[in-house]
A protein has these predicted regions:
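Trp/Phe/Arg-rich N-terminal binding region typifying the photolyase-homology
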Residues: 1-165, 272, 346-347, 395-396, ...
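A general alpha-helix detector
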Residues: 95, 237-238, 252, 343-344, ...
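Glycine/tryptophan-enriched, flexible segments
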Residues: 122, 141-310, 314, 418-502
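Active-site-adjacent bridging/hinge elements
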Residues: 225-229, 319, 332-338
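Structured ligand/cofactor/substrate-binding pocket environments in proteins
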Residues: 277-294, 345-398
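Charged/polar, low-hydrophobicity segments characteristic of intrinsically disordered regions
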Residues: 294-304, 321-329, 391-414, 488-492
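C-terminal, helix-dominated tail/subdomain
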Residues: 310-319, 369, 380-450
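Helix-hairpin-helix/helix-loop-helix acidic hairpins
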Residues: 325-347
């Protein structure tokens, strides 16, 4: 029997620019495997709205795969146990997948799969994606590697060898308990977490949003990205399609570069200057997207522990007190008594998306003003984000909580943000219509006093010699190598980048 090439699709539901699929197709007949893993989908950073989006991506992926003759097996169960069922049914195979930089549990799962492969003599070939570098020796090389990968040609949909009669017969013998003949596992989750304003999943939708943004919809991107009321139509909205792999990051970067070249030639066009500014800004954010995912790849524990040792234990890391539970629930439900904060939370609940500045304000408010530990609030936000990307989410959560040691400490004034980003109050009126009525709650915290206490404590932690040395170590591992920053400075380095508005 010809050795089968099994491609394990995870957060990479596409056929184009798929290195693992391309590599597998050059070695022999290919079968695709997509797995609903109950243990991962039940984690506190997973949600039904994410499952709904993934299911839509998967449905479109399955149709596209059928058109090119790619057999797609959809299974429900845990890895690597499912691989054992597969091996018993068809014999030895070669496993292919993309490298994944996910949460801690997916990292542990991959280690179990690797152990299983080694024990059974199964070769597992992992291909890079998201331009994250495994076993990166130094950050000094990262930007160069990123550029090299971005310039490589995108991979086309590969031609596939037909499956032999023997393989078809072996695949048909797989037990029913192994296979899902529909998308019910994801649908069950989706039914429990309705998100009426979210985008529809699938590659076609992702291409539509990217193309419309590059063709002119992004003209006010730079001007409108900071306000929750104007960012929704002005941002690209491709983040969930990148997160779940309907689009590759290289596709997005190369399409953006092509669009920039085209707009440079549109002399006299009334949108030319603004579009060029917007597209340059957008491309830089695609770069920074990979930069932050690299942080989690290099240090998976960022999801679990404060990066800077001096900040460990400054917030309650045990079970929440009754007071903390009350504060947390008010924040989660959008009933803090601060209208702009509440409006942003309710918008996020409805849409599954929020512009970056307001995401930062929500977590900063919870961490600095309410002084809640970022793990509890980070999990809640992760569930709400359809575009939840662990490699961006957890480093950003720590950044806004002041626990990285290398980023400037951001404490947003919610009233100033309301004045700056919603000057006429239209956004608040839309999402917190009761804010001017007698029944609306009083603020759960004095935001000026709480911000002052947080600022003094966090900056105070950075003043010791030990803290400064620890910051230098963190910067060497994770900091941007921008020419304006000097890692040899006697002062603790400050990585000021922190803007993500896709």
């Amino acid at each position: 029997m010809t050795s089968l090439q099994l491609v394990w699709f995870k957060r990479d539901l596409r056929l184009r620019d798929h290195a693992a699929l391309t590599a597998a197709s050059s070695r022999g007949p290919v079968v695709a495997l997509v797995v609903y893993e109950p243990s991962l989908w039940s984690l506190p950073d997973s949600s039904g709205r994410q499952a709904a989006f993934y299911q839509e991506c998967l449905a479109e992926f399955k149709l596209s795969a059928d058109r090119i003759g790619l057999r797609v097996l959809i299974a429900s169960g845990e890895m690597p146990e499912l691989l054992d069922h597969f091996r018993q049914a068809i014999g030895p195979f070669t496993l292919h997948s993309h490298e994944e930089t996910g949460n801690w549990e997916s990292f542990a799962r991959d280690r179990r799969v690797l152990d299983w492969c080694r024990f059974h003599g199964i070769a597992w070939h992992e291909e890079p994606q998201n331009n994250v570098v495994r076993r990166l020796a130094t950050r000094d090389d990262w930007a160069r590697i990123w550029q090299e990968r971005m310039k490589k040609p995108r991979l086309s949909v590969p031609r596939l060898l037909p499956l032999s009669t023997e393989l078809e017969k072996a695949l048909s013998s797989l037990p029913d308990a192994f296979l899902c003949h529909n998308f019910h596992p994801w649908q069950r989750l989706a039914d429990l977490d309705l998100c009426p304003g979210r985008l529809h999943g699938g590659r076609k939708a992702g291409i539509h949003y990217l193309k419309s943004f590059l063709d002119g919809r992004g003209v006010d991107y730079r001007r409108h990205m900071s306000s929750p009321g104007t960012s929704e139509p002005s941002c690209s909205r491709v983040s969930p399609y990148l997160t779940w792999g309907a689009l590759s990051i290289r596709e997005a970067v190369q399409a953006t570069r092509s669009a920039r070249a085209e707009w440079r030639e549109r002399h006299g066009h009334p949108l030319q200057r603004r579009m060029l500014v917007s597209l340059k800004s957008f491309e830089s954010r695609l770069h920074w997207r990979c930069h932050f995912i690299q942080k989690l790849e290099s240090e998976p524990g960022i999801e679990l522990t404060c990066s800077h040792p001096a900040t460990r234990g400054i917030r309650n890391e045990a079970d929440l007190t009754d007071t903390e539970v009350t504060l947390l629930e008010a924040w989660k439900s959008g009933t803090t008594g601060l209208p702009f904060v509440d409006a942003c939370m309710r918008f996020l609940q409805h849409h599954g998306w929020l512009n970056f500045r307001m995401r930062a304000m929500l977590i900063s408010f919870a961490s600095q003003h309410l002084w809640l530990h970022w793990r509890a609030t980070g999990h809640h936000l992760a569930q709400l984000f359809v575009d939840y990307e662990p490699g961006i989410h957890w480093p950003q959560i720590q950044m806004q909580s002041g626990t990285t040691g290398i980023n400037t400490i951001r404490i947003y004034n919610p009233e100033k943000q309301a004045t700056d980003q919603d000057p006429d109050g239209a956004f608040v009126r839309r999402w917190v219509s009761e804010s001017t009525l007698p029944g609306y709650p009083s603020p759960i915290v004095d935001h000026l006093d709480s911000a002052k206490r947080a600022r003094e404590l966090l900056w105070g932690l950075r003043k010791t010699t030990v803290s400064r040395l620890q910051s230098q170590v963190i910067f060497q591992k994770h900091g941007s190598r921008s020419g304006s920053r000097n890692p040899k400075s006697k002062k603790p380095p400050i990585d000021t980048q922190g803007v993500f508005d896709f």
